[in-house]
């Protein structure tokens, strides 16, 4: 198990409160959203993996926001294509 120094992760995010929010959000993505870890898992829990990703500079609030916007746009485009297909088949 890799040792995570929270202080290093705090320095990447800015403050410990935002760190908790970003790490929890990323851990939730990995646990329930099917998102793959960006660092080796090494039998760590999603929260530890999230902290390691933050510490290595791979995940920030901006990165999470951009990914969610992109996924939302892709989902909306797929829904629009499905509706369009239904309308053309009538």
Curated annotation (Swiss-Prot):
Q: Name one Pfam family in it.
A: RNA_pol_Rpb6
Origin: domain of life: Bacteria
Catalytic activity of the protein: RNA(n) + a ribonucleoside 5'-triphosphate = RNA(n+1) + diphosphate
Q: Which GO terms describe its molecular function?
A: bacterial-type RNA polymerase core enzyme binding; DNA binding; DNA-directed RNA polymerase activity
The answer to whether keyword Membrane applies is no
Give a GO biological-process term.
DNA-templated transcription initiation
Q: Provide this UniProt record's keywords sorted from A to Z.
A: DNA-directed RNA polymerase, Nucleotidyltransferase, Transcription, Transferase
Q: Where is this region: Disordered?
A: 70-90
Q: Name one GO cellular component term.
A: cytosolic DNA-directed RNA polymerase complex
Q: What's the Enzyme Commission number for this chain?
A: 2.7.7.6
Q: Which SMART domains did the record assign?
A: RNA_pol_Rpb6
User: What family is this?
Assistant: Belongs to the RNA polymerase subunit omega family.
Role of this protein: Promotes RNA polymerase assembly. Latches the N- and C-terminal regions of the beta' subunit thereby facilitating its interaction with the beta and alpha subunits.
Q: Could you describe the subunit structure of this protein?
A: The RNAP catalytic core consists of 2 alpha, 1 beta, 1 beta' and 1 omega subunit. When a sigma factor is associated with the core the holoenzyme is formed, which can initiate transcription.
Q: Which PANTHER family does the UniProt entry name for this protein?
A: DNA-DIRECTED RNA POLYMERASE SUBUNIT OMEGA (PTHR34476:SF1)
Q: Know the name of this protein?
A: DNA-directed RNA polymerase subunit omega
Which organism is this entry from?
Vibrio cholerae serotype O1 (strain ATCC 39315 / El Tor Inaba N16961)
Lineage, highest ranks first: Bacteria, Pseudomonadati, Pseudomonadota, Gammaproteobacteria, Vibrionales
Gene symbol of the encoding locus: rpoZ
């Amino acid at each position: 198990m890799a040792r995570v120094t929270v202080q290093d992760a705090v320095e990447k995010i800015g403050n410990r409160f935002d760190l908790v929010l970003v790490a929890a959000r990323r851990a939730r993505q990995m646990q329930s959203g099917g998102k793959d870890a960006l660092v080796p898992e090494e039998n760590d829990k999603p929260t530890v993996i999230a902290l390691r990703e933050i510490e290595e500079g791979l995940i920030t609030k901006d990165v999470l926001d951009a990914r969610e916007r992109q996924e939302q746009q892709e989902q909306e485009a797929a829904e629009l294509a499905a509706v369009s297909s239904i309308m053309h088949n009538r």
